[in-house]
C-alpha cells in the first residue's frame, strides 16, 4: 500500500500567516503540516509515499528528503495552472494503478488514530466522514442503512437545517488499485476531457454511484481531532485544537471573549446563560423572519426606544436601548465624575471606566461576601461620595438586596444627592416576586436612580447584544441617545424586542424551572469534596476551592481534559483564597460539570 498526498490542492497561500509558503508549510507545535503528515505515514511502513502537485521551486522535495524517512518518497510535480484534486489524481494515475492507496490532502491535520482506522478499513473505496460542523467544506454524503455512501450533495448546500444532521467528507480516502484502474480512472479521464470545471474527488465518485450503482464504504471520525486548513481562521482554530501547550490553548480560547460556537465540543461555564429560554417557538419565529431581517435596515433609536418602553412598562423618554448593556455602561459612566462608591468584588466594567482617584471601594470580607443596604449606608455615610454603583444581585457573589431594603438605599442616596446606578442584569433570577426597580412610579420618585439591565443575560440571547438603561433623568437619557449610534442595534435584535411580549408567560415558566435547577445544582456542588458553595440568587454560583486546590490549575485541567470552560476569580478577590464562578445551565450540562469536577479533583468515574 502507498500514500498519495495531494499537495496544496486548493492552490492558495495563507496571507498574513505564512506569506512565503503554502498551507502544508505552516507549523504546528514546531513542525510543518507536511512533516507531521509524513512522520505519521512513516510509522506504517508504506511501500512508498507520493507527493503530487506543487512546484519544484518550492523546495518540497529537498525538504521532505531531509527528514530521513524510512519510507521511500516520490514526487510528481504540477507546474500548470490546473490544480484541482481531480487533476492531481490524474497526474498520479500510474502510481494509483499499481497498488492500493491512501489519498490525503496536504492541508489536513489529524490524529494518528484516524489514520490507523482508515488503513484497517475494508472496501474497494473508503471515505473518512464526520458529523457536520460549520467550518467543514467537504461534500455532504447520503448514506444507506449499511452506512455506505449512495450519493453526494453539492459542496455548498444551502439547507443548513438538514446539514446539522448530516455527514461530510474530510479529504481522507482509501482506493484499491483495481477500483481506481477499472472504474475511477476511465470516468476521470472522460470528465477532464469534457469539462474545464474544477471539481473535487467526490465528483467522480458521485458519477460512479449513479452510473454503476457503485458503493463507497465509510470510516467515521470518532473522538479523533482533525482540521482542514484553508485560510487564516482555520490556521488559528487548528492551532488551538492541536497545541501541545496547555497554557497557550487556555490563553487563546479565553482570550477570544466569546465566539465559542467555533468549539462545539466544549461546554461553556464561563459566560452566563438562561438555560430554559428562549423557547423553541420564539427561536422558530426568529428563523422564519431571518431573510427579511437580513435584507432590511433596522429602525433608529426613536422606534427602538418605543419598543423597549412598551416591553418594560416605562415612558419612552425614560429609556434607552443599547448594543448590549456594555454600550450603555460606557455611555452612562462617561457622564459621571467625582468620588464614586463601589462594592467589591463586582463587575469590573464599571470601576474600569473611572480613574483610581475617583474610586471609593467597600471591600466585602464576610465569609459568603454578603452585605445589605445598612452595610452600604454605614460604610459610605462619611465618605463624601457623589455616585454609588451597585450590581444587584452582585456579580460574582450572587448576593441580593431585597426590594424593600433597596428602597431604603434609594431614599438615603436621594437625600444625600448621590447618583445611584443599579445593574439589574440578574434580578429576574431571584426568588423574590417582582424584585425590579424598573417601574415608572419608582423612576418618577427617584430622579437620582439609573437602572441598567442586560437583556442578553436575562433572556438568554447574548448573540443579539441587547441592553437597556432607565431613569427619570431625561436630560441624561437624551444625551445618551445622541452619544450612541442612531442604528446601534441590528434588525434581528429589534425584531426580538418587537415580539418579546408574546412570550412573557413562557419566560416566567423558564425562570421557575431555572430556580429549581439552581437549588439542585448548588446541592450537587456541595457534594463535591474540596468545594465550598456560596449561596446565590443569580444565574451563577461562586465556589471556594479548599484543600489547597489552585483555581488556575483547575481551569486548565477542566479545559484540556474535560473540554469545559470555567471562570476563576483571582483578579477580583485579594484574600489569598481560590474561587470560581460557575454559570448555571440545564440539568444535563450541570450533571456533566459535576462529574467532570469529581474526575479532575478526585479521579472519580
Question: Which residues are covered by each model-predicted region?
Answer:
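N-terminal nucleotide-binding beta1-loop-alpha1 segment
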Residues: 1-20
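Conserved beta-loop-beta/alpha segment of the NTase-like Rossmann-fold superfamily
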Residues: 60-145
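Conserved core of the sugar-phosphate nucleotidyltransferase
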Residues: 111-195
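PLP-dependent aminotransferase class I/II
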Residues: 165-169, 277-279, 300, 448-527, ...
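N-terminal "arm"/small-domain region of PLP-dependent enzymes with the aminotransferase-like
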Residues: 240-296, 384
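PLP-dependent aminotransferase-like
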Residues: 327, 334-391
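Active-site phosphate-binding strand-loop segment of PLP-dependent enzymes
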Residues: 369-433
Amino acid at each position: 500500500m502507498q500514500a498519495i498526498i495531494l499537495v496544496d490542492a486548493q492552490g492558495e497561500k495563507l496571507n498574513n500567516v505564512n506569506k512565503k509558503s503554502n498551507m502544508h508549510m505552516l507549523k504546528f507545535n514546531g513542525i510543518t503540516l507536511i512533516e507531521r503528515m509524513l512522520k505519521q505515514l512513516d510509522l506504517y511502513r508504506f511501500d512508498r509515499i507520493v507527493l503530487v502537485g506543487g512546484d519544484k521551486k518550492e523546495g518540497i522535495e529537498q525538504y521532505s528528503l531531509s527528514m530521513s524517512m524510512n519510507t521511500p518518497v516520490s514526487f510528481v510535480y504540477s507546474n500548470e495552472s490546473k490544480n484541482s484534486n481531480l487533476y492531481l489524481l490524474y497526474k498520479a494515475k500510474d502510481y494509483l494503478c499499481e497498488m492500493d492507496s491512501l489519498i490525503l490532502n496536504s492541508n489536513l491535520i489529524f490524529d494518528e488514530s484516524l489514520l490507523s482506522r482508515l488503513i484497517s478499513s475494508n472496501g474497494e473505496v473508503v471515505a473518512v466522514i464526520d458529523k457536520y460542523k460549520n467550518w467543514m467544506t467537504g461534500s455532504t454524503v447520503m448514506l444507506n442503512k449499511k452506512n455506505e455512501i449512495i450519493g453526494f450533495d453539492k459542496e455548498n448546500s444551502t439547507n443548513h437545517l438538514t446539514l446539522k444532521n448530516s455527514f461530510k467528507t474530510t479529504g481522507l480516502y482509501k482506493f484499491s488499485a483495481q477500483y481506481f484502474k477499472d472504474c475511477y480512472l476511465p470516468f476521470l479521464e472522460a470528465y477532464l476531457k469534457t469539462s474545464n470545471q474544477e471539481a473535487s474527488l467526490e465528483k467522480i465518485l458521485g458519477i460512479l454511484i449513479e452510473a454503476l450503482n457503485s458503493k463507497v464504504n465509510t470510516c467515521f471520525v470518532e473522538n479523533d481531532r482533525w482540521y482542514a486548513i484553508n485560510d487564516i481562521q482555520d490556521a488559528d482554530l487548528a492551532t488551538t485544537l492541536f497545541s501541545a501547550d496547555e497554557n497557550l490553548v487556555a490563553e487563546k480560547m479565553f482570550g477570544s471573549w466569546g465566539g465559542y460556537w467555533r468549539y462545539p465540543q466544549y461546554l461553556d461555564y464561563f459566560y452566563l446563560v438562561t438555560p430554559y429560554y428562549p423557547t423553541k417557538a420564539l427561536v422558530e419565529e426568529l428563523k422564519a423572519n431571518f431573510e427579511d431581517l437580513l435584507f432590511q435596515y433596522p429602525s433608529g433609536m426613536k422606534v427602538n426606544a418605543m419598543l423597549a418602553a412598551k416591553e418594560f412598562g416605562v415612558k419612552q423618554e425614560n429609556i434607552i436601548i443599547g448594543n448590549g448593556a456594555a454600550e450603555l455602561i460606557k455611555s452612562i459612566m462617561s457622564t459621571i465624575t467625582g468620588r464614586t462608591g463601589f462594592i467589591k468584588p463586582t463587575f469590573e466594567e464599571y470601576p474600569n471606566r473611572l480613574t483610581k482617584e475617583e474610586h471609593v471601594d467597600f471591600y466585602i470580607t464576610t465569609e459568603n461576601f454578603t452585605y445589605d443596604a445598612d452595610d452600604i449606608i454605614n460604610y459610605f455615610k462619611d465618605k463624601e461620595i457623589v455616585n454609588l454603583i451597585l450590581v444587584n444581585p452582585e456579580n460574582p457573589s450572587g448576593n441580593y438586596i431585597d426590594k424593600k431594603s433597596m428602597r431604603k438605599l434609594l431614599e438615603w442616596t436621594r437625600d444625600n444627592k448621590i447618583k445611584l446606578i443599579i445593574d439589574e442584569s440578574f434580578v429576574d433570577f431571584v426568588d423574590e416576586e417582582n424584585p425590579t426597580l424598573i417601574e415608572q412610579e419608582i423612576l418618577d420618585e427617584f430622579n437620582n436612580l439609573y437602572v441598567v439591565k442586560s437583556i442578553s443575560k436575562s433572556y438568554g440571547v447574548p448573540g443579539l447584544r441587547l441592553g437597556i438603561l432607565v431613569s427619570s433623568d431625561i436630560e441624561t437619557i437624551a444625551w445618551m441617545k445622541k452619544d450612541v449610534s442612531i442604528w446601534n442595534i441590528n434588525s434581528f435584535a429589534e425584531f426580538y424586542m418587537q415580539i418579546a411580549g408574546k412570550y412573557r408567560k413562557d419566560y416566567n415558566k423558564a425562570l421557575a424551572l431555572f430556580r429549581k435547577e439552581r437549588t439542585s445544582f448548588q446541592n450537587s456542588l456541595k457534594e463535591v469534596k474540596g468545594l465550598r458553595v456560596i449561596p446565590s440568587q443569580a444565574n451563577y454560583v461562586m465556589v471556594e476551592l479548599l484543600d489547597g486546590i489552585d483555581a488556575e490549575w483547575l481551569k486548565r485541567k477542566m479545559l484540556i481534559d474535560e473540554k469545559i470552560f470555567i471562570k476563576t476569580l483571582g483578579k477580583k478577590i485579594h484574600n489569598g483564597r481560590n474561587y470560581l464562578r460557575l454559570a448555571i445551565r440545564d440539568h444535563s450540562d450541570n450533571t456533566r460539570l459535576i462529574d467532570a469536577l469529581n474526575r479532575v479533583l478526585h479521579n472519580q468515574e
